[in-house]
Curated annotation (Swiss-Prot):
MF (Gene Ontology): DNA-binding transcription factor binding; identical protein binding; mitogen-activated protein kinase kinase kinase binding; p53 binding; protein serine/threonine kinase activator activity; protein serine/threonine kinase binding; receptor tyrosine kinase binding; ubiquitin protein ligase binding
Assembly notes: Interacts with SOX6. Interacts with DAZ1 and DAZL. Interacts with IL17RB. May interact with FAM168B. Interacts with INCA1. Interacts with EIF4G1 and EIF4G2. Interacts (via PPAY motif) with NEDD4 (via WW domains). Interacts with transcription factor TCF4; the interaction results in localization of DAZAP2 to the nucleus. Interacts with transcription factors TCF7 and TCF7L1. Interacts with transcription factor LEF1.
GO cellular component: cytoplasm; cytoplasmic stress granule; nuclear body; nuclear speck; nucleus; protein-containing complex
Low complexity: compositionally biased ranges: 1-13
Keyword Electron transport recorded: no
Annotated protein name in UniProt: DAZ-associated protein 2
PPAY (motif): residue ranges: 39-42
Species in which this protein is naturally found: Rattus norvegicus
Its job: In unstressed cells, promotes SIAH1-mediated polyubiquitination and degradation of the serine/threonine-protein kinase HIPK2, probably by acting as a loading factor that potentiates complex formation between HIPK2 and ubiquitin ligase SIAH1. In response to DNA damage, localizes to the nucleus following phosphorylation by HIPK2 and modulates the expression of a subset of TP53/p53 target genes by binding to TP53 at target gene promoters. This limits the expression of a number of cell death-mediating TP53 target genes, reducing DNA damage-induced cell death.
Disulphide bridges, residue numbers: none
Gene this protein is translated from: Dazap2
Pfam family, one: DAZAP2
Subcellular location: Cytoplasm; Nucleus; Nucleus speckle; Nucleus, Nuclear body
InterPro entries: DAZ_assoc-2 (IPR022730)
Length: 168
Protein backbone atom coordinates (compact mmCIF):
# COMPACT_ATOMS: atom_id res chain seq x y z
CA UNK A 1 0.00 0.00 0.00
CA UNK A 2 2.49 2.60 1.10
CA UNK A 3 6.03 2.22 -0.13
CA UNK A 4 7.49 4.81 2.24
CA UNK A 5 7.10 2.65 5.33
CA UNK A 6 5.41 3.24 8.64
CA UNK A 7 5.04 6.40 10.61
CA UNK A 8 8.01 7.32 12.81
CA UNK A 9 7.68 6.40 16.47
CA UNK A 10 7.24 9.19 18.91
CA UNK A 11 9.67 9.49 21.82
CA UNK A 12 8.26 8.55 25.20
CA UNK A 13 7.50 11.20 27.77
CA UNK A 14 10.28 11.46 30.34
CA UNK A 15 9.47 10.09 33.77
CA UNK A 16 9.05 12.80 36.41
CA UNK A 17 11.02 12.39 39.61
CA UNK A 18 8.89 12.13 42.76
CA UNK A 19 9.29 15.56 44.32
CA UNK A 20 7.31 17.85 46.55
CA UNK A 21 3.78 18.18 45.22
CA UNK A 22 2.29 21.63 44.76
CA UNK A 23 -0.80 20.77 46.81
CA UNK A 24 -0.74 18.79 50.04
CA UNK A 25 -2.00 15.26 49.61
CA UNK A 26 -4.07 15.33 52.81
CA UNK A 27 -5.51 18.33 54.55
CA UNK A 28 -5.68 18.06 58.33
CA UNK A 29 -8.76 19.81 59.68
CA UNK A 30 -9.98 19.77 63.26
CA UNK A 31 -12.91 17.47 63.84
CA UNK A 32 -16.22 19.19 64.56
CA UNK A 33 -17.54 18.58 68.07
CA UNK A 34 -20.49 16.18 68.30
CA UNK A 35 -23.94 17.51 69.00
CA UNK A 36 -24.73 17.27 72.68
CA UNK A 37 -28.11 18.99 72.77
CA UNK A 38 -31.27 17.93 71.02
CA UNK A 39 -32.72 20.40 68.51
CA UNK A 40 -35.33 22.80 69.93
CA UNK A 41 -38.92 21.65 70.04
CA UNK A 42 -41.35 22.97 67.45
CA UNK A 43 -43.23 24.95 70.09
CA UNK A 44 -40.02 26.68 71.20
CA UNK A 45 -39.33 28.00 67.72
CA UNK A 46 -42.60 29.89 67.53
CA UNK A 47 -42.76 31.39 71.02
CA UNK A 48 -43.35 35.15 71.06
CA UNK A 49 -39.89 35.62 72.59
CA UNK A 50 -38.34 34.59 69.28
CA UNK A 51 -40.22 37.20 67.24
CA UNK A 52 -38.16 40.22 66.27
CA UNK A 53 -39.67 43.36 67.85
CA UNK A 54 -39.98 45.10 64.47
CA UNK A 55 -41.98 42.22 63.00
CA UNK A 56 -44.66 42.26 65.69
CA UNK A 57 -45.96 45.77 65.11
CA UNK A 58 -49.40 46.24 63.60
CA UNK A 59 -50.32 49.53 61.90
CA UNK A 60 -52.92 51.49 63.80
CA UNK A 61 -56.29 51.97 62.17
CA UNK A 62 -58.15 55.24 62.34
CA UNK A 63 -61.38 56.12 60.56
CA UNK A 64 -61.26 59.73 61.80
CA UNK A 65 -59.84 60.92 58.49
CA UNK A 66 -62.10 61.11 55.43
CA UNK A 67 -61.19 58.49 52.86
CA UNK A 68 -59.13 56.49 55.33
CA UNK A 69 -59.03 52.78 54.66
CA UNK A 70 -60.79 50.59 57.20
CA UNK A 71 -58.65 47.62 56.17
CA UNK A 72 -55.19 46.65 57.28
CA UNK A 73 -52.68 46.72 54.43
CA UNK A 74 -51.57 43.28 53.28
CA UNK A 75 -47.91 42.69 54.08
CA UNK A 76 -46.03 42.25 50.81
CA UNK A 77 -42.81 40.90 52.27
CA UNK A 78 -42.17 38.32 54.93
CA UNK A 79 -40.30 39.67 57.93
CA UNK A 80 -37.36 37.65 59.16
CA UNK A 81 -36.56 37.54 62.85
CA UNK A 82 -33.33 36.34 64.47
CA UNK A 83 -33.63 33.59 67.04
CA UNK A 84 -32.34 33.50 70.59
CA UNK A 85 -28.80 32.77 71.68
CA UNK A 86 -29.53 29.12 72.49
CA UNK A 87 -30.02 28.33 68.82
CA UNK A 88 -27.19 28.77 66.28
CA UNK A 89 -27.32 31.72 63.89
CA UNK A 90 -30.40 30.83 61.91
CA UNK A 91 -33.31 32.84 60.61
CA UNK A 92 -36.88 31.66 60.42
CA UNK A 93 -39.59 33.56 58.53
CA UNK A 94 -42.17 35.32 60.64
CA UNK A 95 -45.44 35.92 58.81
CA UNK A 96 -47.63 39.01 59.05
CA UNK A 97 -49.47 39.40 62.33
CA UNK A 98 -53.13 40.42 62.24
CA UNK A 99 -55.22 41.05 65.34
CA UNK A 100 -58.32 38.84 65.65
CA UNK A 101 -61.42 40.42 64.14
CA UNK A 102 -59.52 42.75 61.81
CA UNK A 103 -60.37 42.87 58.10
CA UNK A 104 -57.65 42.06 55.58
CA UNK A 105 -58.06 42.99 51.91
CA UNK A 106 -56.48 40.66 49.33
CA UNK A 107 -56.68 42.37 45.96
CA UNK A 108 -56.98 40.20 42.86
CA UNK A 109 -57.07 37.00 44.87
CA UNK A 110 -60.53 35.78 43.88
CA UNK A 111 -60.62 33.52 40.86
CA UNK A 112 -63.98 33.55 39.08
CA UNK A 113 -63.39 30.04 37.75
CA UNK A 114 -62.66 28.56 41.16
CA UNK A 115 -65.26 26.47 42.94
CA UNK A 116 -65.04 25.67 46.63
CA UNK A 117 -67.53 22.83 46.80
CA UNK A 118 -70.79 21.56 45.34
CA UNK A 119 -73.27 24.43 45.28
CA UNK A 120 -71.11 26.69 47.41
CA UNK A 121 -72.51 30.20 47.31
CA UNK A 122 -70.45 31.71 50.09
CA UNK A 123 -66.71 31.70 49.60
CA UNK A 124 -64.50 29.78 51.90
CA UNK A 125 -60.73 29.77 51.98
CA UNK A 126 -59.41 26.20 51.82
CA UNK A 127 -56.37 25.19 53.89
CA UNK A 128 -53.00 24.97 52.15
CA UNK A 129 -52.03 21.62 50.62
CA UNK A 130 -49.70 19.44 52.71
CA UNK A 131 -46.11 20.58 52.39
CA UNK A 132 -47.01 23.98 50.93
CA UNK A 133 -46.78 27.26 52.82
CA UNK A 134 -50.04 29.16 53.29
CA UNK A 135 -50.74 32.26 51.22
CA UNK A 136 -51.62 35.66 52.69
CA UNK A 137 -55.36 35.01 52.88
CA UNK A 138 -54.87 31.64 54.58
CA UNK A 139 -52.46 33.21 57.10
CA UNK A 140 -54.98 35.92 57.96
CA UNK A 141 -57.79 33.38 58.45
CA UNK A 142 -55.54 31.23 60.66
CA UNK A 143 -54.89 34.28 62.85
CA UNK A 144 -58.60 35.03 63.25
CA UNK A 145 -58.87 37.94 60.83
CA UNK A 146 -61.71 38.49 58.35
CA UNK A 147 -60.58 38.29 54.73
CA UNK A 148 -62.08 40.30 51.88
CA UNK A 149 -60.98 39.13 48.45
CA UNK A 150 -61.48 41.18 45.28
CA UNK A 151 -61.98 39.56 41.91
CA UNK A 152 -59.07 39.13 39.54
CA UNK A 153 -59.50 41.29 36.45
CA UNK A 154 -59.65 39.46 33.16
CA UNK A 155 -60.76 40.28 29.63
CA UNK A 156 -61.11 38.66 26.23
CA UNK A 157 -57.49 39.24 25.21
CA UNK A 158 -55.79 38.37 28.49
CA UNK A 159 -57.94 35.30 28.95
CA UNK A 160 -59.54 33.96 32.04
CA UNK A 161 -58.86 31.09 34.35
CA UNK A 162 -61.94 29.06 33.52
CA UNK A 163 -60.07 26.76 31.12
CA UNK A 164 -61.78 28.07 27.97
CA UNK A 165 -60.21 28.56 24.57
CA UNK A 166 -59.89 31.56 22.30
CA UNK A 167 -60.10 30.81 18.58
CA UNK A 168 -58.43 33.33 16.27
Amino acid sequence: MNSKGQYPTQPTYPVQPPGNPVYPQTLHLPQAPPYTDAPPAYSELYRPSFVHPGAATVPTMSAAFPGASLYLPMAQSVAVGPLGSTIPMAYYPVGPIYPPGSAVLVEGGYDAGARFGAGATTGSIPPPPPGCPPNAAQLAVMQGANVLVTQRKGNFFMGGSDGGYTIW
